[in-house]
Curated annotation (Swiss-Prot):
It is found in: Cytoplasm; Nucleus. The gene is CSN8. Component of the COP9 signalosome complex (CSN), a complex involved in various cellular and developmental processes such as photomorphogenesis and auxin and jasmonate responses. The CSN complex is an essential regulator of the ubiquitin (Ubl) conjugation pathway by mediating the deneddylation of the cullin subunits of SCF-type E3 ligase complexes, leading to decrease the Ubl ligase activity of SCF. It is involved in repression of photomorphogenesis in darkness by regulating the activity of COP1-containing Ubl ligase complexes. This is COP9 signalosome complex subunit 8. Ubiquitous. It comes from the Eukaryota. GO terms for molecular function: metalloendopeptidase activity. Component of the CSN complex, probably composed of CSN1, CSN2, CSN3, CSN4, CSN5 (CSN5A or CSN5B), CSN6 (CSN6A or CSN6B), CSN7 and CSN8. In the complex, it probably interacts directly with CSN4. Interacts with itself and (via PCI domain) with CSN7 (via PCI domain). Interacts with COP10. Binds to the translation initiation factors TIF3E1 and TIF3H1. It comes from Arabidopsis thaliana (Mouse-ear cress). PROSITE patterns: PCI.
């Protein structure tokens, strides 16, 4: 079984392509009738789904993984631990699951990249959902210490009130794009005029 496309994507840090590559290879290997369960990079496959925010597919993959593999490969179980936290929206638990396992060299870079990406996703979620938030809750959402979380949001333009231990969200400017520019509108007007006359 040739897993070189997965290894190449990992080496190139193309983590957003891992899930699709694994899906394609799994279908190819299964259609050829090759026994692949023992050698399959299930942890990487699961992490690939989490990286592209596809918890549904990760959950179905988890259900298809043989019990013997789950019992023999703790990294697969650790990867699924992240999935369980994502599934239940336990934001702080995601970071605990990431830090709670000593990842293999193969998975370490991908887990670190996912952690960074997840922090950015959480920051965007906070940006759209809150006007103010406690420093404690902010640290839980971002998976950081309170000091690091404070520094992170201040660098992104938020204001922090040390007395109340609250952070105020810097609201994004609402961008309103004009759907049709004037030249397109003019051409449409001329076209309709031509059709009517």
């Amino acid at each position: 079984m040739d897993l070189s496309p997965v290894k190449e994507a990992l080496a190139a840090k193309s983590f957003d392509k891992i899930a699709d590559i694994c899906d394609t290879l799994m279908l190819q290997v299964a259609s050829e009738g090759i026994e692949y369960h023992d050698d399959w990079p299930y942890a990487i496959h699961l992490l690939g789904y989490f990286y592209v925010d596809d918890c549904d597919s990760a959950r179905f993959l988890w259900k298809r993984i043989p019990t013997a593999i789950k019992e023999r490969k703790p990294e697969v179980v650790a990867a699924w631990g992240i999935g369980q936290k994502l599934w239940t929206h336990d934001y702080a638990g995601v970071y605990e699951a990431i830090r709670g396992y000593d990842w293999s060299q193969e998975a370490k870079d991908m887990v670190a990249a996912f952690s960074d990406l997840y922090t950015k996703r959480m920051f965007q979620l906070l940006l759209s959902a809150y006007s103010t938030i406690t420093i404690h809750d902010l640290a839980l959402f971002l998976g950081m210490t309170e000091d690091d979380a404070t520094t992170y949001v201040v660098e992104n333009g938020w204001t922090v009130d040390a007395a109340s231990q609250m952070a105020s969200v810097k609201k994004q400017a609402v961008k309103r794009e004009q759907k049709v520019d004037s030249s397109k509108l003019q051409r449409l007007t001329e076209y309709v005029f031509h059709l009517e006359h």
